[in-house]
Regions:
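Short glycine/threonine-rich loop-to-helix capping motif typified by GTGT followed
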Residues: 270-279, 308-325, 330, 344-351, ...
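ACP-dependent fatty acid/polyketide chain-elongation machinery
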Residues: 1-67, 89, 247-259, 354-368, ...
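A glycine- and small-aliphatic-rich helix-loop capping segment at beta-alpha/alpha-beta transitions
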Residues: 22-27, 112-129, 179-182, 202-215, ...
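Flexible, low-complexity linker/loop segments at domain and module junctions
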Residues: 1-8, 95-98, 293-299, 330, ...
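Condensing-enzyme catalytic core mediating Claisen C-C bond formation in acyl metabolism
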Residues: 5-9, 36, 216-293, 302, ...
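Active-site-proximal alpha-helical scaffold in enzymes
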Residues: 78-91, 145, 150-153, 159-194, ...
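Conserved beta-ketoacyl condensing-enzyme motif
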Residues: 8, 29-164, 193-204, 297-313
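Glycine-/small-residue-rich "gating" segment that lines the acyl/pantetheine channel
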Residues: 123-133, 174, 178, 194-251, ...
Length: 420
């Protein structure tokens, strides 16, 4: 059967750079850091005392007050991004066949703050007998964001959550893409959300020695591909892409941001938390996405890298890019928007895919900020264009986004300019 074409017709985002996709993109292009001292809890005694938090967050701008109280922060962020995306798409909710509209969101951890609060309450009061909120489980579970969005809009199409650590929302986009091109839905609200900036989240990653401890200079802490990088900066947020079958989008006169043309998945099969030192999984996933899109390496102008600002991860991804793209690796642009947003964990792929869509539609590549010192490891290879410290205008025919998760999960998606 002939596969259908899939386009992006709406965007939504709540990130450390802004509470809308427009504000997020504007600050991304400007090279603004979202890092600051933690305000969501008292981090005085933690090794890491800063993060990339969503600022000025008021869920009631997007969600009914009564409903918001029944949601963990991650689900609130997810809902806000979906509301924005659906509005931006111009979907007529009275006319669209809601049986053919789905919701797929990627979530890496889910309601960790809800779990933390309930466990703490139980520990302090267990002598009185077990007492838990009836909303404990529905607020905590990772699938509830997709469910809440579906309920809010009355969408009856495919509805589920993908969980593959930091690759979660890229897998959500990939699953949505495949369902649409197979004709199993007309529209899918696809994205991801995460809100793990809490004692358990920061403490857990600190215990793994995964986080930067640059407490005296948070805004310069996330520095992918720079010699002095010392770990990732935790972020939170949500991103949404409205993916739509092309003929359905054309029939309703929808604005089209870009076309989604390929996706890939692979596994490192190497280590629970470390990427393969030779970039094997990264190489395989990019090759898979290019093959799926029926594109050559030379067709890609921009790679939004996983680029978390860890020593091994940045090196292995650079190796993989050079192996897959050959000489063309030196002609395209590479950047890590995590240098600005921090690592949004399960939401990273959705927000970074949004950055790729905007790069394709506006012909500008956001920067990798905070670079001030070259790494001595030759594999980083500074002949590559990492788009250091300042956005670059260029023709972006197609953009590729990488996300890699604990457990060796790798996912990749490709977007290109839409043409008839």
């Amino acid at each position: 059967m002939e596969l259908k074409r899939v386009v992006v017709t709406g965007l939504g985002a709540v990130t450390p750079l802004g509470n809308t996709p427009e504000e997020t993109w504007e600050n991304m292009v400007k090279g603004v850091s979202g890092a600051a001292p933690i305000t969501l809890f008292d981090a005085t005694n933690f090794k890491t005392q800063f993060a990339c938090e969503v600022k000025n967050w008021n869920p009631n701008e997007w969600i009914d007050r009564k409903d918001a109280r029944k949601m963990d922060r991650y689900a609130q962020l997810a809902m806000a991004s979906a509301v924005q995306g659906v509005k931006d798409s111009g979907l007529d909710l009275d006319q669209v066949d809601k049986n053919r509209v789905g919701v797929i969101y990627g979530v890496g951890i889910g309601g960790i703050k809800t779990f933390e609060e309930e466990a703490s309450y139980y520990a302090l009061n267990k002598e009185k007998g077990p007492r838990f909120s009836p909303f404990f489980i529905p607020k905590m579970i990772a699938d509830i964001a997709a469910g809440q969005i579906s309920i809010h809009f009355g969408f009856h199409g495919p509805n589920f959550t993908t969980t593959s650590a930091c690759a979660s929302s890229t897998n959500a986009l990939a699953d949505a893409f495949n369902l649409l091109r197979l004709g199993k839905a007309d529209v899918i609200v696809a994205g991801g959300a995460e809100a793990a900036i809490c004692e358990c989240g920061v403490g857990g990653f600190n215990a793994m020695k995964a986080l930067s401890t640059r407490n005296d200079d948070p805004t310069h802490a996330s520095r992918p591909f720079s010699a002095s990088r010392d770990g990732f900066v935790m972020g939170e947020g949500a991103g949404c892409l409205i993916l739509e079958e092309l003929e359905h989008a054309k029939a309703r006169g929808a604005r089209i941001y870009a076309e989604m043309v390929g996706e890939g998945e692979s596994a490192d099969a190497y280590h629970l938390t470390a990427s393969h030192p030779e970039g094997l999984g990264a190489k395989l996933v990019m090759e898979a996405a290019l093959a799926d899109a029926q594109m050559q390496p030379e067709d890609i102008d921009y790679i939004n890298v996983h680029g978390t600002s860890t020593h091994v991860g940045d090196i292995s991804e650079a190796k993989a890019i050079k192996e897959v793209f050959g000489e063309h690796a030196y002609k395209l642009n590479i950047s890590s928007t995590k240098s600005m947003t921090g690592h949004l964990l399960g939401a990273a792929g959705a927000v970074e895919a949004l950055a790729c869509v905007k790069a394709v539609s506006e012909d500008i590549v956001p920067p990798t900020i905070n670079h001030d010192e070259e790494d001595k490891d030759p594999e980083i290879d500074y002949a590559l264009n990492y788009t250091f410290n300042q956005a670059q205008k260029r023709a972006v025919r197609a953009a590729l986004s990488n996300t890699f998760g604990f457990g060796g999960h790798n996912a990749c998606v490709i977007f290109k300019k839409y043409a008839e």
